[in-house]
Amino acid sequence: MARDDAKVAADAVALWTRLGVLPPDLDPGIRAKELCAAAYHDGELIGVSTMVLDMLPQLKARFGFFRCLIAPEYRQQGLARTFGAYSRQLLAEWSKRHPQEKVLGMATIVESSALDEFSKQPVWEAPGMMGLVLVGYTQKGRQIRVSWFEHARLD
């Protein structure tokens, strides 16, 4: 079956709206253009990841910033780790095909309280955690973590 991007985007907007997770001033259509991966169960969208390319100034490098949302009834099943690993793989492959974009890895800003125990570890080495390394904090005190690609080279 062919991928239906318009359906995935509409389903993602519906999921974000149902869960009330988008900032009030953000057009959901903008976030939908950032979709990276989606998962369905019995025809219902149960999770999405998004990716935004941006510089991480303290590392002087460009990363894909990863976000993930899993529907509450499907959480605590390892889906977020699966989304993370899969999204990282997609981004790494894309980065190799587009070296002019100079995307050197995947970054994430930790927002989930479910990761509080992991957040005490500077490097996340557990299976599926992609070796995410703590590199700093946002102004709101949230952890910034990165996973460098094997092909990454600094200028």
Spans of features found by a protein language model:
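A conserved beta-strand-loop-helix scaffold within acyl/acetyltransferase catalytic domains
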Residues: M1-R3, A12-C68
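Solvent-exposed amphipathic alpha-helical surface segments
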Residues: L19, P23, L90-H98
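Short, flexible loop/turn elements at secondary-structure junctions
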Residues: H41, L69-P72, V110-S112
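Terminal substrate-recognition subdomain of acyl/acetyltransferases
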Residues: P57-Q58, K96-D155
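Hydrophobic, well-ordered secondary-structure scaffolds
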Residues: G64, Y86-L90, L104-V110
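Conserved acetyl-CoA-binding loop-helix of GNAT-fold acetyltransferases
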Residues: I70, Q76-E93
